[in-house]
């Protein structure tokens, strides 16, 4: 962050009650680098509280928030600030996380997944004016917008999804900035990946439950496509679960004919769905190839095995 190529900025590092030597290291760095300020919290309060603490002590109108283990591209702030300063209706911007650890199959699969989820879907969502969520690992905010919505909430498991909905329900825009790069580490074990995805799913359900009553007014019409997309995804997941339950149940007991699942192998419609998925991955990787050392064909080989 201290290497960012922007003329005027400060770096605020929030130590969220760490029990290791993080506090000592940050204090030493603060003495070494003039532009670094450190905020120490007495005990771990969660990311939302840490973000609020950093925002409260900041002296500028614009905030660029990254995770402690993320590596910010030197030009990322420049690209994000362009959108925040040039468009007065923009309350937040979200960057483009790129995965560093690709030694395992899970790591390679997530490269394609991130290009699809973070890249292509956010580009598509912008066509109808709203984005489901900023990327928690790299996001920029206008402090005025944050103050209007009461900053980040402590009672939501995914503060990034929550703040995105709060800001957009107050009619602020969120822009996706693909050139604002940030390099991150992702889970490379099934257990770590499972916990992460359960957390993301729970976060989506929480915001849908919390803000559904606010959707029934004219100023929230642009949020309906995002809410509908989220709801359809949930229904899809439960249908897939039901298919598996009915299939395995049918192995032991008689299931009514109209409910019987004879095979888990995809039929012709499953093949069409798989081809559509592969086309989506190809397009997303092709668009993002400029940010990934032109290795999109190598990455595409691995997404073929995406479940």
Where are the regions that the model predicts?
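Acidic helix N-cap motif at the loop->helix transition within catalytic regions
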Residues: 20-28, 51, 75
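Acidic donor-binding loop at a coil-to-helix junction in glycosyltransferase catalytic cores
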Residues: 157-163
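Membrane-embedded multi-pass helical conduit in multi-pass membrane proteins
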Residues: 232-307
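Short, acidic, metal-binding catalytic loop of nucleotide-sugar glycosyltransferases
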Residues: 1-8
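Long helical/loop segments within the catalytic core of UDP-sugar-dependent glycosyltransferases
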Residues: 33-40, 48-50, 56, 60-61, ...
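A conserved acidic beta->alpha catalytic loop
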Residues: 15-24, 43
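Catalytic donor-sugar/metal-binding loop of nucleotide-sugar-dependent glycosyltransferases
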Residues: 164-182
């Amino acid at each position: 962050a201290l290497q960012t190529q922007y003329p005027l900025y400060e770096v605020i590092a929030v130590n969220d009650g760490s029990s290791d030597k993080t506090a000592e290291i940050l204090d030493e760095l603060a003495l070494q680098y003039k532009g670094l300020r450190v905020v120490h919290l007495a005990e771990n309060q969660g990311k939302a509280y840490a973000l609020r603490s950093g925002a409260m002590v900041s002296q500028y109108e614009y905030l660029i928030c990254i995770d402690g283990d993320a590596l910010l591209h030197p030009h990322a702030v420049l690209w994000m600030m362009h959108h925040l300063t040039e468009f007065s209706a923009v309350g937040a911007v979200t960057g483009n996380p790129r995965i560093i650890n690709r030694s395992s199959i899970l790591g390679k699969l997530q490269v394609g997944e991130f290009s699809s989820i973070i890249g292509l879907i956010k580009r598509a969502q912008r066509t109808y004016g709203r984005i489901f969520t900023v990327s928690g690992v790299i996001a920029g905010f206008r402090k005025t917008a944050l103050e209007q919505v009461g900053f980040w909430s402590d009672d939501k498991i995914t503060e990034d999804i929550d703040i995105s909905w709060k800001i957009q329900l107050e009619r602020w825009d969120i822009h996706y900035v693909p050139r604002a790069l940030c390099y991150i580490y992702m889970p490379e074990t099934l257990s770590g990946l499972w916990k992460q995805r359960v957390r993301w799913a729970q976060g989506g359900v929480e915001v849908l439950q919390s803000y559904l009553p606010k959707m029934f007014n004219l100023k929230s019409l642009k949020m309906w496509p995002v809410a509908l997309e989220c709801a359809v995804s949930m229904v899809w997941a439960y249908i897939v679960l039901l298919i598996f339950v009915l299939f395995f149940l049918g192995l032991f007991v008689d299931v009514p004919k109209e409910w019987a699942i004879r095979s888990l192998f995809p039929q012709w419609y499953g093949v069409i769905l798989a081809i559509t998925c592969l086309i989506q991955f190809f397009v997303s990787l092709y668009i993002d190839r400029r940010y990934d050392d032109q290795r999109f064909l190598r990455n595409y080989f691995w997404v073929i095995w995406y479940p």
